[in-house]
Amino acid sequence: MKKNILKILMDSYSKESKIQTVRRVTSVSLLAVYLTMNTSSLVLAKPIENTNDTSIKNVEKLRNAPNEENSKKVEDSKNDKVEHVKNIEEAKVEQVAPEVKSKSTLRSASIANTNSEKYDFEYLNGLSYTELTNLIKNIKWNQINGLFNYSTGSQKFFGDKNRVQAIINALQESGRTYTANDMKGIETFTEVLRAGFYLGYYNDGLSYLNDRNFQDKCIPAMIAIQKNPNFKLGTAVQDEVITSLGKLIGNASANAEVVNNCVPVLKQFRENLNQYAPDYVKGTAVNELIKGIEFDFSGAAYEKDVKTMPWYGKIDPFINELKALGLYGNITSATEWASDVGIYYLSKFGLYSTNRNDIVQSLEKAVDMYKYGKIAFVAMERITWDYDGIGSNGKKVDHDKFLDDAEKHYLPKTYTFDNGTFIIRAGDKVSEEKIKRLYWASREVKSQFHRVVGNDKALEVGNADDVLTMKIFNSPEEYKFNTNINGVSTDNGGLYIEPRGTFYTYERTPQQSIFSLEELFRHEYTHYLQARYLVDGLWGQGPFYEKNRLTWFDEGTAEFFAGSTRTSGVLPRKSILGYLAKDKVDHRYSLKKTLNSGYDDSDWMFYNYGFAVAHYLYEKDMPTFIKMNKAILNTDVKSYDEIIKKLSDDANKNTEYQNHIQELADKYQGAGIPLVSDDYLKDHGYKKASEVYSEISKAASLTNTSVTAEKSQYFNTFTLRGTYTGETSKGEFKDWDEMSKKLDGTLESLAKNSWSGYKTLTAYFTNYRVTSDNKVQYDVVFHGVLTDNADISNNKAPIAKVTGPSTGAVGRNIEFSGKDSKDEDGKIVSYDWDFGDGATSRGKNSVHAYKKAGTYNVTLKVTDDKGATATESFTIEIKNEDTTTPITKEMEPNDDIKEANGPIVEGVTVKGDLNGSDDADTFYFDVKEDGDVTIELPYSGSSNFTWLVYKEGDDQNHIASGIDKNNSKVGTFKSTKGRHYVFIYKHDSASNISYSLNIKGLGNEKLKEKENNDSSDKATVIPNFNTTMQGSLLGDDSRDYYSFEVKEEGEVNIELDKKDEFGVTWTLHPESNINDRITYGQVDGNKVSNKVKLRPGKYYLLVYKYSGSGNYELRVNK
């Protein structure tokens, strides 16, 4: 819960709209399957590396439970146990594939070729053009060694324009002569040409192949293929010809004639939709055809006015056919993907229509026609992204409202518990009884968790999980729409997102999952408890999450505590024991392997073996289990590592562990699954609250008791807290064991009482201590149903809500606000602040400056007009002023040298303002070596200001000043090595100025990438715009990931300068979906650059090489 998510991206969750969260999630929902159907598809139109990077899952904490369709599937595939995803969307959103299932055996029969001889470029270059084309015509493309690799041979082969033209001519001839059963080498011809265009894109020696004018030379061949009477869906050969044409268009080019010639194929497909849509090969053919055209057109139109494109207004027949496909209606599970394709590409190609309004109306019609179905989400998204969110009526469409309404459609019911701190939103087919059971299940898990962990105080308050929200869809099918609604992965049985304090899952039948809803909830609820009460900091962030330290623990103890009971401790579940029993003895994890497991383990059995470790420690080595939890609770990485190493290296412990696994496996047949008792659901009848509290306190020997009552939708509950003082301490671990048994005995004793409400009691103990007279002492907590409603006050307590930063600097004013606090049945009459350093304040809003670095708890107490109070606290970390990280904007106060902001480094722009009474800003910078320094300060507003530069140690004599030149205050001066200050001030208080400060000539070292950064979760952070990053791709290092954040919408220019001769490029991806490529680098000599308009959010920049090795410099400019 964790350090306010470091403002990395989870901050944006509370601020961004739903449409920002789910941006581009559904736009290509059906394409992923087709992009990888054929090996040759891996080279896309303009070659962009496939970035199906699972490491993007490490941006936000999503706690995922196993999704187990059946035991064999889970046993055989890790996809049934989905790893945590830290993205927010962290979350990676998996693409939703159409129902058409891909199988290699469904590839065209023409692919088979008994001639498996291989050919290299040295041989091919020795053939005449006629010999070459005859050979190509009769072999498969993958018989040519290194076809897509740049080499001396491929350079010579494709460097011969006449040879390439001969291949194009041969393709044209095959296009005229192919039959329904003989493609005349069309697939191989197109793949050879695609290889040439691929290599031409990245290599200057073949740059002519990247010229659209040359690529247009393929158009006659394309038209010849289309004019052939066999150009239609039919035999495997005919389908493959259409597929090859689509791929070639994507790598080469097309025009309006080529596009409109595709209409008969689309029409044939639509008119036979029920027959053709389930056919993988025909679906591939149509998809490749449409996709290839769109890829070519979008590349040609990039950053250009679409109205200037030669096909603008000339492809209406094609657009109309896409419209007919998209609005086909009467869809089935087998045909839905096709209409999805139609709507998506209708939007894309509609940009070239002269009737924009008709396109938008069609998209709006799709929203209504496929109400809250996948296609409706795609249509709404395309209006938002392709048409700037403007509807056919000229007004802004409310995408957020659409998503909210969709969520209400799928989750129409809301249930509240514990004064609104436990909320369940559910589908209409999820029974109320099950909802109640889930609430009581949480209490059983909570009681056993706190016993073991020894803490029930939230590590941080004021975060989203102060209110736990659970969203339960009716079925796995409806759950899939959560991708569209909330932008999270749904290829799982359920997941918990810590920064949202929300758990998502679905109701299921035994046929759909071996785990019941309650079992899965118990697992996920444990993740909530881990985050709130045990592991400090955001999941996936910090040293505890390096090197798979806690992966086994997170998942293993979640499986363990899912077996929590009311009075029998924690029991093993049959559903988990089944895996241990089925796994062969020689395949079982060792203790060392289990303790070092992670999501990269292919079989994902560490869930089950992690459970086995937790159960082993719980049953046979509780001292180690408690020490382990203490180390985590105290963020003591060193002690935790020592515990893990000791266990890993102890052969005897491993033997005991293996024996324990066998004991668990032997219990499989007789094991059960701990679920809540029917006793929780009974009508318990009235019993006076004071009697209940008294009887519990007496039975448990408690003193200093206090009680709070909680109101829920179906019943009310109470929480009773007190102090237990026992006999002489026998040591912490013996005391723990005896206390746990005593508490279970108390619960069982109370359950024998005539009032059945005692059967709803759960209890735990925390805060172990020993008194001065050596007596053991615990804080004990009981929770149960409350039938005396008189104990529930009619006055609703106010709700305190604090807003403020999670970090600050010593001496800097920090603003805190309680404006979001509220009182539902009255008004708040006072706000009392405690800043944790001895200072206090009163008022709705407050400003405070800390004098020392440290971590402080800021607490706001609000009091309503009836005297009820509420408090909220959060942690703020105060640091000494950072003198190493470059700044990009001023921070007040900075009126004099003592308060100067900095450092300023070369290449990083610093923005500031002088408004109203703020008449001066001061910054510092360091000069690395003697020489000329230039300061440029472009501005807007009044020119009635200037700047002065002072050398450190002499604040009386300035050494330079700025002069006005073209709306910029500029100056160049000779400087010596050392620290300097620039003092910017205005001449009168009436002037308002906004400025940008740039300094050149400092000799600052450029920032360097931090290896290993070959996956997105290890991305090197680009701290500021306009910063030069030095990187290298040498030897086996083939990729580097970078990340940066955009605070305000605007254009970003990404530039990569090659320092060596090698093949390198980059692609840009949004944090919300790594598979969504926003743009890519355009090669121009040694520079690979592009400009793109970006919205606020986090982005990942992937730099990768495709030939050779070398160094580069990278800048993200704004």
Swiss-Prot record:
Its EC number is 3.4.24.3. Binds about 7 Ca(2+) per subunit. The metallopeptidase and PKD domains each bind 1 Ca(2+), while each CDB binds 2. The keyword Cytoplasm does not apply. Residues 111-786 are annotated as: S1 metalloprotease domain, degrades both FALGPA (furylacryloyl-Leu-Gly-Pro-Ala) and type I collagen. GO terms for molecular function: calcium ion binding; collagen binding; endopeptidase activity; metalloendopeptidase activity; tripeptidase activity; zinc ion binding. Ca(2+) 6 binds at E1011, N1013, D1014, D1037, R1039, D1040. Upon purification gives 67 kDa, 78 kDa, 82 kDa and 116 kDa (full-length) proteins all of which have the same N-terminus; only the longest form digests insoluble collagen. At least 2 in vivo isolated forms (C1b and C1c) are missing the second collagen-binding domain, ending on Lys-1006 and Lys-1018 respectively. It is found in: Secreted. GO terms for cellular component: extracellular region. Residues 797-885 form the PKD domain. This is Collagenase ColG.
